[in-house]
């Protein structure tokens, strides 16, 4: 079970994203309880296009987010991840990534990690943990 600080950081990220989407012309619904696979549902007020959003948040000035193996299979044309860096007291940063790119990236990087020897030359054990990095700001929303 996640600790209270992580839950608060996650909730803050979801509400920052919801506010930003509203500001950009979307009508947003944030479910009151956990919904499998999605944190936010949004509808473009002009086109009426609907999208589902998975929000992942870090409270630090880093561009690394933890996911799980199940995220390798969460793929759809209308599914997006918004990775949030709360940056402590600075303005949050948003990295917007289509689900297909996230799924492929975390699968490839995990397989590469498994093939790379550990610090002492040992083989890595397979886990359900996956990591998404955007150190080069390829998906940074300016």
Task: Label each residue range with its predicted role.
Residues 1-36, 41-142:
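Mixed-charge (Asp/Glu-Lys/Arg
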